[in-house]
UniProtKB/Swiss-Prot annotation:
Component of the SRB8-11 complex, which itself associates with the Mediator complex. This is Mediator of RNA polymerase II transcription subunit 12. GO terms for molecular function: transcription coregulator activity. Keywords: Activator, Nucleus, Repressor, Transcription, Transcription regulation. One of its GO terms (cellular component) is mediator complex. The keyword Nucleus applies. GO terms for biological process: regulation of transcription by RNA polymerase II. It is found in: Nucleus. The keyword Nucleus applies. Residues 1-21 are annotated as: Disordered. Belongs to the Mediator complex subunit 12 family. Pfam families: Med12. Component of the SRB8-11 complex. The SRB8-11 complex is a regulatory module of the Mediator complex which is itself involved in regulation of basal and activated RNA polymerase II-dependent transcription. The SRB8-11 complex may be involved in the transcriptional repression of a subset of genes regulated by Mediator. It may inhibit the association of the Mediator complex with RNA polymerase II to form the holoenzyme complex.
Length: 1322
């Protein structure tokens, strides 16, 4: 007998003796007891303590205690019997309740009899108590399964299971039970009206939807616990447990896998905050193999679509994170931890790289087929991911795959024809020679980027430039394009062009895929030497020399180029030693206009000395010592404020003056001096007008703002007007916009506000605040305090609008404050007389100008309509000079709209032709804004007045290229051409800013000699005008004349882009196609250039026809096209290879006329004429490995096959037979172009991401748990249908069997002697 059964244990309530009691006999000392001791004495000592015996009497046998009871022995026998039955069923192939290879089971034996648990109705409290017992492993599952609470909702069950950490096997049992109960209920309700498959589909979908909903909620909860480590740890435990639940349901097929896959991909797509990326990617890795491993035939298309979608999403996320500067969003970090940020960013990018690489190496290449606009963005990233850390042996294979994908994404299909140069060889190209860039004339670029030119003319906000530069500026010839744009005479009004080009180059140098600095410098100096070789007339047409000098000096300031490098190249070129060379003059003029430092003195003087024999004045007037002497003589002049004729000095002297004067006014004045209106305007004129050093003005602007030297609101108004006038340069040249604006707003709201209440209430800065918010929105988002300041000023401006109309007392108090006369009653004042008197004082009494202006602004704010009426009368009277009106506009007392309403257009034309900075820059700002709003009306009024011809031309040239005004510009120029009936306006616009005599050009075609990428917009207008006014017969001659005048110019397609008339387009297409087909069999380089340009022109023209099905083909052209196709089809393979480029261009005609040609082929097939189809098929087989060509032909043949199938749906056309060549067309994929030795198998297991299976048993070889069984009909000896047991019908039975309750699956089949056999019924 075990002694443990009779081991005495002390009672729990008895307190043990402690060592603190003295170790003496208690009999010798009196007993001092406590109340507690009395209680112990009564309960235990008095009554005694004993343990009851296990048997009734000591005399009874102890056999039952020593040996196990009969029920226990019976239970053991039952377990062994169950094992015997299991073995017997498996051996003799009876219906098995357990499949040997089915590892999704949790127990070895479930029994044949199956009984759903009884459902009982419980209160919410008892239901939760039942779930708590389920989560406890101490509670027997057999006890719990006798009854299941009724009314559990799916979401409630799942939430309780992960919050209470119910063991996984119990969760699975509960989910299976709920599945089975719901399934049984659904069958009884359906009554045979709904199929079994539909019921199961609904059941699985409902549960899966709830599962993913909870998972989404759990992922988003992470943001709540960032600052609470305890809650964050608990959240991790909960989501880990839930993922184990979900993972087991996924493996056991207790959810709809395709729904989960679709949700996961969509969820990854929609998350934007970086804080959710790690967990989302972790979840994706868990189910990664499932998403990629779908192989069922019925879901193959769906899975393929999902993988394509997933690939694009992963590339998009990679692009977003790569471009992001900060991944951390934590309130604890005022300045983000750089190391932590970079580590997190690299970790996420690494996981994304693993996913993308795994898809690339294990899936079909079609996974990366995407819309062209997306491909242009993600292409570079895919190259970067896949070619990183790749051995030299694998690189060619990877590049071939990438080339295939690139060809497919860029293949020419209907609606996606592209006239841009192809870039499939490499994402970036930085090495070039000028011969590769120019074709003939220096501005005749072989490749022009219209998008780049449009952005340069129209502008982007500061934050958009980085993204645009990374994506769009990928070739070195684009650097030449933007330089030529900046120095072109037609862009000389762009004061910011030099700094804009410099910023683009600096951003490109610092970008991930950067150009090397030495490469850029080499291209710039090569371009300068190219300019020196041009004649004087050619140079005047393409370069405005002051802007070229300014651009190079800006480059020098940014460190993009270096003058010593230029001098060394100049000496080594030998130009200085040529007798009487114009090159020397060009280089010497350039050198004396560059920034020269004292350390370059000897080199600089040496160059000038070398030309003394032919041009001695360069050294005599501009040697370095002479430059310093002139600079020293100008210092007193600058300090006295005499800035006249400074612009006549060479650029080197102007730079010296600008740098010295900036240091003088900022650092050498001793005590800080406040600035006034006069000082601000004069400094602007000096730096921006006389010296042309914009960046020095903005350096001074930062200085006076940070030192708070503007102590008057009127001065601040003048200052902000200048910043608005230089809006583009403000975005480029202010170093820290946030700090600048915060300081400016602080001065405005805290200091200046209390100094002059009247000025604060009357002077409006709303236009400047709006400008900043519009162009610097991303900067405002980065700083919460700046957001609050901006919100505060906008709220103030909003209240100011109705301030005076709703509060007349405020008007009176301000009036008394301005006048300083407390006895004056505002109500007694005559409103018109107040305006009239103060206008006179403003115009003629400078000492009273400030107060009078405030009174007029008060009148305007309190009685706006009466004020404007009086000014309209004032303008109609004409008692003023233009200079006086200009001053009123500058002081914001008069608007252009008031003059416009009086129909005083002569006066309006006079004003818009004026340029004035004497009273600030508000006049220029108002004029520019007014012209943009009324561009068409103003230009037409200027046209009707010949005296303003120069103003008209200047306005058309300056505003015409702007995309927002392009349509109005076209209308105005077309109107002028119709009215004048000659080309004089075009001629004037073409030579604007060139400083050359107006050449007499009577022939329209001669004007096309001036065509270049900077004036393409003007020739688009001219071409559209001429085409509209030409008949069909003249169009052919007109097109041929243009081609003859400009040669094979890549701009030819662009000048026809505005033509949209259907008849004119069709006529031009016929003309182009005839010329194209006449030379398509020529292989000379010039012929290929001609074919390329002709086809690009046809593509541009065809885009204007929305309904391409109506775009027919001339019968003569069609026959010529068919004969040409037949000629190519008859060529041997070796010969055909020489014509790949010709054939590529030819097939674009098929795309343009696709529906027409498909219809023609179909009609030919009706007449049993397969000649053209056979020729296309022959070409498809003979083109070899020309991937792009093969894709085009395959697309054509598949389109033709689809067209025939669609047309023959009608019963009447069933007699038409599909051509045999189309039936033989193979199933085609882009991976078909891979060579046999470069198959995808080599990359099958490469870069597979480490997958985390939370709580899921890993298997050596995954088996499909959904085994296919078939019901066998013994009478017919055939398999009738597939039989499948659903996963939830494998529910473990823990209950006692009830009579009459039998499982409706396994045992029911057993009664009919059915068997589950894994045999193929076929």
């Amino acid at each position: 007998m075990s002694p443990s059964k009779y081991l005495l244990t002390p009672p729990e309530e008895l307190h043990p003796l402690t060592d603190s009691n003295p170790q003496i006999y208690p009999d010798f000392d009196p007993w001092i007891h406590t109340k507690e001791e009395d209680k112990i004495l009564k309960e235990f000592v008095a009554k005694g303590y004993y343990t009851a015996s296990r048997v009734n009497f000591e005399t009874i046998s102890a056999r039952s205690a020593l040996q196990g009871s009969l029920p226990k022995v019976s239970s053991l026998l039952g377990d062994e019997l169950s094992k015997i039955i299991e073995i017997r069923e498996q051996e003799i192939n009876r219906i098995s309740t357990l499949d040997i290879e089915d590892s999704t089971r949790f127990t070895k034996w479930s029994g044949q009899d199956f009984h759903l648990p009884n459902r009982v109705t419980l209160t919410d409290q008892k239901r939760n108590l039942w779930l708590q017992e389920l989560s406890s492993s101490n509670t027997s599952l057999r006890k719990l399964t006798k009854s299941v609470p009724h009314g559990f909702r799916k979401r409630h069950i799942l939430e309780q299971c992960y919050t209470q950490f119910v063991p996984i096997y119990r969760v699975i049992w509960l989910i299976k039970s709920c599945y089975a109960i719901e399934w049984k209920g659904m069958i009884s309700k359906a009554k045979g009206e709904t199929t079994h498959e539909e019921l199961l589909s609904t059941l699985y979908k409902d549960w899966t939807d709830n599962m993913v909903l909870i998972l989404e909620k759990l992922v988003f909860e992470v943001s709540k616990y960032y600052n609470d480590p305890g809650q964050l740890k608990y959240w991790k435990l909960r989501i880990a447990h839930y993922l184990k639940i979900l993972g087991n349901c996924y493996e056991m097929e207790l959810l709809n896998r395709s729904t989960l896959h679709q949700w996961l991909v969509d969820f990854l797509s929609k998350i934007e905050s970086f804080e959710f990326y790690p967990m989302t990617l972790h979840i994706l890795s868990i189910f990664w193999s499932g998403i990629l491993g779908t192989t069922e035939e019925d879901t193959e298309i769906e899975s393929s679509f999902l993988i394509i979608k997933l690939s694009e999403i992963l590339l998009r996320k990679y692009h977003i994170i790569s471009e992001s500067k900060c991944m951390i969003n934590d309130s604890k970090y005022i300045i983000n931890d750089v190391q932590r940020n970079s580590k997190l960013k690299e970790s996420v990018l690494l996981r994304l790289r693993q996913f993308i690489s795994h898809i690339f190496h294990t899936q079909s290449l079609e996974a990366f087929i995407m819309p062209k606009q997306n491909w242009n963005i993600y292409k570079n990233y895919l190259y970067q991911i896949l070619l990183q850390n790749v051995s030299d042996e694998e690189t060619p294979k990877l590049k071939k795959k990438l080339k295939l994908i690139s060809y497919r994404n860029e293949s020419l299909r209907l609606g996606s024809l592209d006239v841009e140069p192809s870039r499939e060889t490499s994402p970036f190209s930085t090495e070039l020679t000028l011969d590769n860039v120019f074709s003939g004339n220096i501005l005749n670029l072989k490749n022009v980027s219209p998008e780049l030119l449009g952005v340069l003319d129209s502008g982007l906000s500061g934050s958009e430039w980085s993204l645009f530069i990374d994506q769009k500026i990928t070739k070195m010839e684009q650097v030449i394009e933007i330089i030529l744009w900046a120095i072109n005479p037609s862009r000389k009004h762009r004061y910011d062009s030099c700094h804009l080009v410099a910023k683009i180059l600096v951003l490109k140098i610092n970008s991930q895929e950067s150009f090397q600095e030495y490469s850029i410098e080499d291209v710039i100096w090569s371009l300068i030497f190219h300019f020196s070789k041009l004649s004087k007339l050619e140079l005047q047409k393409i370069v405005w020399l002051p802007k070229l000098h300014q651009l190079l000096n800006v480059f020098i300031g940014y460190g993009i180029i270096k003058v010593p490098t230029y001098i060394r190249r100049l000496i080594s070129s030998g130009v200085l030693y040529l007798p009487e060379s114009e090159n020397k003059n060009f280089h010497c003029k350039l050198l004396i206009n560059l920034k020269i430092s004292p350390i370059m003195k000897s080199q600089y003087n040496m160059v000038l000395k070398n030309v003394m024999e032919y041009a001695p004045h360069f050294y005599e007037k501009y040697n370095f010592d002479k430059l310093v002497s002139i600079f020293e003589s100008l210092k007193p002049k600058l300090l006295s404020g005499d800035f006249e004729r400074l612009e006549e000095y060479p650029g080197s002297i102007r730079i010296m003056c600008s740098e010295w004067y900036l240091s003088q006014i900022c650092f050498n004045q001793g005590e800080l001096q406040k600035v006034n209106n006069h000082k601000i305007i004069k400094t602007f004129q000096l730096f921006c007008i006389n010296l042309g050093e914009l960046h020095h003005f903005f350096g001074w602007a930062e200085y006076i703002v940070y030192h708070q030297l503007i102590d008057d609101l009127e001065n601040l108004e003048v200052f902000t007007d200048i910043l608005l006038y230089l809006d583009k340069a403000f975005l480029l040249l202010i170093n820290d916009h946030i700090l600048f604006m915060k300081t400016l707003l602080h001065s405005y709201m805290r200091d200046l506000r209390i100094k002059d209440k009247a000025a604060f209430e009357l002077i409006n800065f709303k236009s400047f605040w709006k400008f900043f918010v519009k162009n610097c929105a991303n900067m405002i988002e980065m700083d919460s305090s700046l957001q609050n300041q901006i919100a505060e000023v906008f709220e103030l401006e909003r209240h100011r609008k109705d301030h005076f109309t709703k509060m007349p007392n405020e008007t009176v108090s301000l009036y008394l404050e301005i006048t300083g006369n407390k006895n004056t009653k505002f109500e007694e004042q005559n409103f018109p007389s107040v305006i009239q008197q103060n206008i006179k004082k403003v115009l003629h009494n400078p000492e009273d100008e400030s107060n009078c202006r405030k009174l007029l602004l008060l009148c305007k704010a309190s009685h706006a309509s009466e004020y404007n009426k009086f000014l309209s009368i004032f303008v109609k009277r004409g008692d003023f000079t233009v200079h006086e009106l200009l001053k009123l506009i500058s002081l914001k007392l008069l608007s252009f709209e008031v003059i416009q309403k009086t129909s005083h257009f002569d006066l309006l034309c006079e004003l818009v032709s004026q340029v004035s900075f004497n009273y600030g820059l508000n006049f220029e700002n108002e004029k520019n804004a007014f012209v943009k709003r009324n561009f068409k009306q103003i230009t037409l009024q200027l046209f009707s007045r010949p005296t303003f011809r120069d103003t008209l031309v200047r306005m058309l040239v300056e505003y015409g290229p702007n995309s927002n005004l392009s349509e109005k510009s076209a209308q105005v120029v077309s109107h002028i051409l119709r009215e004048e009936k000659n080309m004089s306006i075009i001629r004037d616009m073409l030579i604007y800013g060139m400083n050359i005599e107006n050449e007499a050009i009577d022939n329209t075609i001669d004007l096309y000699r001036y065509l270049n990428f900077t004036n393409t917009w003007l020739f688009q207008i001219l071409t559209e005008f001429n085409v509209k006014n030409s008949n069909a017969e003249d169009l052919s001659d007109f097109f041929s004349s243009i081609v003859g005048a400009i040669g094979y110019n890549s701009l030819l397609p662009k000048i026809f882009s505005n033509i949209s008339d259907k008849k004119q387009v069709s006529t031009l297409l016929t003309v182009i196609e005839r010329q194209f087909l006449a030379r398509v069999l020529e292989t000379e380089k010039s012929a290929l250039v001609f074919l390329h340009i002709m086809m690009d022109t046809e593509i541009v023209l065809s885009r204007h026809l929305v309904n391409m099905s109506s775009l027919g083909m001339d019968s003569e052209v069609l026959e010529l096209f068919k004969n040409t196709i037949a000629t190519f089809a008859k060529m041997p393979n070796d010969t055909l290879k020489k014509y790949d480029e010709n054939l590529n261009e030819l097939l674009k005609i098929v795309i343009i006329h696709e529906k027409f040609i498909l219809r023609h082929c179909f009609e030919s097939i009706e007449l049993r004429d397969h000649y053209m189809v056979d020729n296309f098929y022959t070409l498809f087989h003979n083109t070899g490995k020309d991937l792009k060509l093969k894709l085009l032909l395959y697309d054509l043949l598949t389109s033709l096959k689809s067209y025939i199938l669609n047309e023959t749906k009608d019963q009447a056309l069933h007699s038409i037979k599909m051509p045999s060549v189309l039936n033989q067309l193979p199933k085609f994929a882009i991976s078909s172009f891979l060579d046999s030795e470069g198959t995808e198998d080599e990359f099958l297991d490469k870069d597979e991401p480490s997958l985390i299976r939370l709580g899921i048993c890993d298997k050596q070889a995954k088996t499909n748990s959904a085994l296919k069984y078939f019901v066998f009909n013994k009478k017919s000896s055939q398999f009738d249908c597939i039989f499948k047991i659903e996963p939830f019908q494998y529910l473990v039975n823990y209950q006692e069997p009830l009579e009459g309750e039998l499982n409706n699956t396994s045992l029911s089949l057993g009664l009919f002697d059915a068997r589950l056999e894994k045999t193929n019924p076929s």
